[in-house]
Amino acid sequence: MKSKVIKVALTGGIASGKSLVSDLLEIHGCKIIDLDVISREVVMPGTKGLQELVGTFGKSILSSDGSLDRKNLRDVLYKKGRNRALIEQILHPKILHKMKAMMDDCHEGVMIVVIPLLVEKELWGPFDRAILVDCENETQIKRLMERDDIDSAKAKTMLLAQASREQRLRLNEHLPTDVIENNSRVSDLKEKVQALNQKLFAFL
């Protein structure tokens, strides 16, 4: 059945290239909702999200200007296993509430919702399809080391905190899934995204 809007979840492992793919899809006319962006908005100074984080972990997670120091929060997250659960308990309901409100405001076209933890949190319910940005683990580690200026051990720890590549590749058991491999040149990725964009708009 033809629909005025198609809801597509975009996911992938850390440093797989999700942001680049979503940027390219936006250029081609897709509407983008990015949970990484929302996650920053719900911890802006003065928000309940930031107040609850400070109440739980103390002012050491704040920068000198009162904003969230994301590096310090990340250190807290990896220090104790239960800290991750506490952070998620505080932030995830706020993020998902804002995501739903933004999705409800979109009534036509191709809607792309970037959800890094789609597989881990089994959030496929609202969506018609999925896009999985996939790359080799070694590529992720290299990109993480360059992007975050960390060593390989820290990068591997960050990878282990997420679903495995194999788990993500089973996403098609829950949603029709287009896999975009991102192991090579940006020019190759652009061609793949352009073809996928044409496929998605054909569903409308």
Where are each of the predicted segments found?
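Walker A (P-loop) phosphate-binding motif
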Residues: 1-37
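An amphipathic alpha-helix signature
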Residues: 24, 28, 50-54, 137-145, ...
